[in-house]
């Protein structure tokens, strides 16, 4: 109950509900937080912030939650937008180190500090990214952001530009044998940008590594836009994507048991 607005389930009772994105910038996040009172969410982000899903809407996710331990105390690292939180995911901070200023917007300027893949290399821990390359993982291709082609933007392949380490200069123009080259690993199911919905070729590399027992010690999976559950895409796309990942992992009982 916030600002006289009660929680509300979506009108369409299934996971194909498409919600528009709410404000998720630094200013609105801190306004909703309100110095720890957390009482200004509706005022800062509209009444839609009170929406929620039930087991009827997202049955697959509820089934997973009932079958497995789920870390449900999940919070973002920064009360701010997407890229600073992805910088936390892959570097442990959003700047303010190595001479870089703190990032509180979606810019990736001046990203020059040490990333987690580099720390894993130094510790002798293997790692790999599983993603689709879209039309390419270089700067000119948007680092794998959803491709453009045909009649307009397509969202079924690429990685939505969400592999943020690729914005660091040292990850660009990597040679094949470079220790950071696993950041460029990925399928490329349609380099021309004519994506096909629900294409299981997205999981070929993960399936092969599971089957061959060659999974790295740390794996990062970066989904295309349509399956990321980022507004305005539906939860059903994320459920399909997660189910294919679990199908790949459980296909090898020895790997699954580990």
PLM regions with names:
Residues 1-258:
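N-terminal pro-sequences and low-complexity stem/linker regions of secreted or lumenal proteins
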């Amino acid at each position: 109950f916030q600002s006289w607005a009660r929680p509300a389930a979506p009108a369409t009772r299934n996971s194909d509900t498409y919600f528009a994105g709410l404000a998720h910038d630094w200013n609105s996040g801190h306004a909703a937080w309100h110095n720890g009172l957390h009482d200004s969410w509706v005022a800062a982000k509209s009444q839609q912030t009170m929406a929620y899903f039930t087991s009827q809407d997202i049955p697959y996710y509820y089934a997973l939650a009932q079958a497995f331990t789920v870390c449900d105390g999940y919070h973002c690292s920064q009360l701010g937008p997407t890229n600073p939180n992805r910088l936390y995911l892959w570097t442990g901070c959003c700047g303010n180190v190595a001479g870089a200023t703190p990032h509180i917007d979606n810019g990736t300027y001046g990203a020059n500090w040490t990333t987690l893949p580099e720390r894993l290399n130094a510790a002798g821990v293997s790692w790999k990214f599983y993603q689709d390359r879209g039309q390419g993982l270089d700067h000119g291709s948007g680092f794998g952001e959803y491709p453009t082609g045909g009649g307009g933007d397509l969202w079924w392949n690429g990685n939505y530009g969400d592999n943020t380490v690729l914005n660091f200069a040292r990850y660009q123009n990597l040679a094949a044998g470079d220790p950071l080259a696993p950041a460029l690993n990925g399928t490329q199911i349609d380099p021309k940008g004519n994506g096909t919905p629900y294409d299981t070729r997205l999981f070929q590399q993960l399936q092969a590594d599971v089957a061959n027992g060659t999974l790295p010690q740390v794996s990062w999976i970066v989904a295309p836009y349509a399956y990321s559950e980022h507004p305005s895409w539906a939860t059903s796309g994320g459920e399909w994507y997660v189910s294919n990942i679990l199908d790949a992992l459980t296909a090898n009982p020895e790997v699954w048991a580990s």
